[in-house]
Amino acid sequence: MLIKINHPKADSISIQDSEFHWCRPGFSSEIAFFKRGSWVTEPIEPFADYHDGSVGDTAVYSYVPNTLIDAFLDENRA
């Protein structure tokens, strides 16, 4: 699911919570950020601890607690 956000570093967040992603359905999700259709590879707070740490063209955040995502969306949803 891709959700529009108002954030200085990103304009959308992808949230995946199926069994085929790095998550625990119902408790945590895998997320990624995008700006103008491109991956945001720089860690975004408050999710930096979940950033995959890879250097490259993509960046995902694994096993992010859904409560943390919900709080972020409460403040940043477009």
PLM regions and their residue ranges:
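Catalytic phosphate/metal-binding cores of nucleic-acid and nucleotide-processing enzymes, i.e., regions
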Residues: M1-A78
